[in-house]
Amino acid sequence: MLTLGRKALQVPILQGGMGVGVSLGGLAGAVAACGGMGCISTADAGYREPDFARDPASANHRALTAEIRKAKEIAKGAGMVAINAMVATQDYAAAIRTAVEAGVDAVVSGAGLPLELPGIVGTTDVAIAPIVSSGRAAKLILRRWAKEFGRTADFVVIEGCKAGGHLGFSEDDLLAGKCQTLDDILPEVLAEVKPFEAQFGHSIPVFVAGGVYTGADMAHFTAMGAAGVQLATRFITTYECDASQGYKDVLLNARPEDVRIIHSPVGMPGRALNTPLVQALAEGTRFPPRHCARCLKTCDPAKVPYCITHALIEAVKGNVEDGLFFCGANVGRLDRMHTVQELMDELVTEWRQNQ
């Protein structure tokens, strides 16, 4: 049993948030039901709502509330249900407040430094966690939270350079293979959280993500001092994952050589499959947005090479021609569909065998 804020995990496994629409209430609830932490992505959670094109904010908040309630119903009190909220999104604070009102157990936040997160969550029992890629980032965030809000993190997630989606490393370092490894970053972050554990009188569990694939990987990092791990790509090929089967099939058929580092309109590099869209972008083709959902703080529709909302929605539907398929570095190892329970059991069994 691992305590995170006022709640507890029976299994130290987090399911990483995946948007648009890949991790919603179905997947998050199934992971929580197994004793882990299921995570709903707030990114355009309402993309299937009839009024999404006309009023994306209302559609997203309505859907987010429904997905959290769905996950909680599936979990039946086991594990924890969290959201992943990206700092770079326009409705960042509003989405978090909606989730808190809906009864979410935790907020995990990255794609930027979540410096204001404690103030947004307020004086609630909701656990909060930053996603970091270095000890320096962890120190900066926790120092700000302590000084401005008199609060610290309930846990921390390290996302390494092998993660899927948006990455907290420079594009040059990613392409050159010069990024710090999780083996390098974990001791740094563990050292940086120690003073805050002493100051606030409770432990701050640290989870590692990005390239974690097996229970043996989990055993390796817990032996180094991590409380547990976060996985995302492996959960895509579960029956409970909220994406279409077409989306899952694209990842199941992916080879290691299909993975690319791309530039996202979010302003960060990302890891995705080399689909026709990615190939066209690499050749300099621009796909002007047909409609702006106002999803990102920094996006200029007049200049952006493509609309990431449109590309991710097409992906989750299984449209391989027009979709952007984010994935982790180990996507080529995916070889079958399974249930969330089967995956969780496999990971925990391997973890215990390798301790």
Label the predicted regions:
Residues 1-199:
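Active-site entrance/lid segments in N-terminal catalytic domains of soluble metabolic enzymes
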Residues 14, 163-182, 186-207, 213-355:
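Conserved active-site-proximal phosphate/metal-binding subdomains
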Residues 22, 212-213:
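Residue-level detector of alpha-helix initiation sites
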